[in-house]
Amino acid sequence: MASLKNKHFMIGLSLTFIVALFSFLAAKLPILDKVGALTIAILIAILYRHFKGYPEQYSSGITFSSKYLLRFAIILYGLKLNIFDIIGQGSRLLAIDVGVVIFSIVMMLFVNKLLRGDKNIALLLGVGTGVCGAAAIAAVAPIFKSREKDTAISIGIIALIGTIFSLIYTAIYAIFSMTTNVYGAWSGVSLHEIAHVVLAGGFGGSDALKIALLGKLGRVFLLIPLTIVLILIMRFRSSESSSKGRISIPYFLIGFVIMALVNTYVTIPSVLLNILNTVSTICLLMAMVALGLNVAFKDLKNRALKPLMTIIITSICLSSLAFIVVHWLYS
């Protein structure tokens, strides 16, 4: 019996790995490189669920990917941060980033209330839009006690919208006159994922990409204080409602902070850093596959339309406001 359970666990884990690896490699191909590995992974998982059903007997391996590998990926994500660079070179951008995070969450909740959408998904999308997309959503989902299908829907939506917006940014840069500093800063402080920032910022050249990444990594850095604030808010609401549910600091966020400090104070060989970043990406993709397998088409039909409209409106407002502020500061 134990050997059968282990076999089913390995098959479930292997399923998420194979789809993740395929998505990772497919995203390097022309056209698909604009779509992104996250979007590809989630779409394949949802389509698999639709045509083949959820592989219940292999659920232990799939659940391992959606929980433990996801948390491990977030811990390694901290290696992208160098706190001295963000506070030093990116201090002006960091000030904008604070406004971006606050605006994204507040605007998302405001529009969601007008549309009468799902508040939990709106919160996840607000954090994802303001901070760093899928990784931020995955980091705060346990704090909000979100269901896996809501987390998957939120990640799928933000991956799709971020890809579309990054392509729109490149078109705007090609058509209109804009300095590399303005374009890079605008991309960094307003696009959803690091991959989206790299796609759009890289189109403006190496100088634009450098400032774009500084702007984006400042938002990733803000995940640390944001999660502390959210935990305190949830604890207050929990005690106010006499709830017995205890809100604790997720251990993987502590790991995220430790990795950020390690990358700041320790010189890590670039080869090792690249390997760890690839491992982080694969683990994150495996988690996305596992989360996507929990989403049925009826969930998308019933729960995704209003959040999709909400994030489009919020992203347009954020992009417009961010451009005005960046243009004023860098022109």
Swiss-Prot record:
Superkingdom assignment: Bacteria
Keyword field contains Methyltransferase: no
Similarity annotation: Belongs to the UPF0324 family.
Membrane topology: Multi-pass membrane protein
GO cellular component: plasma membrane
Species the sequence originates in: Staphylococcus aureus (strain MRSA252)
S-S pairs: none
Protein name as it appears in the record: UPF0324 membrane protein SAR0338
Transmembrane segment boundaries: 9-26, 31-48, 69-88, 93-115, 122-144, 154-176, 183-202, 217-234, 247-269, 273-295, 308-330
Subcellular location: Cell membrane
One Pfam family linked to the record: Cons_hypoth698
Keywords assigned: Cell membrane, Membrane, Transmembrane, Transmembrane helix
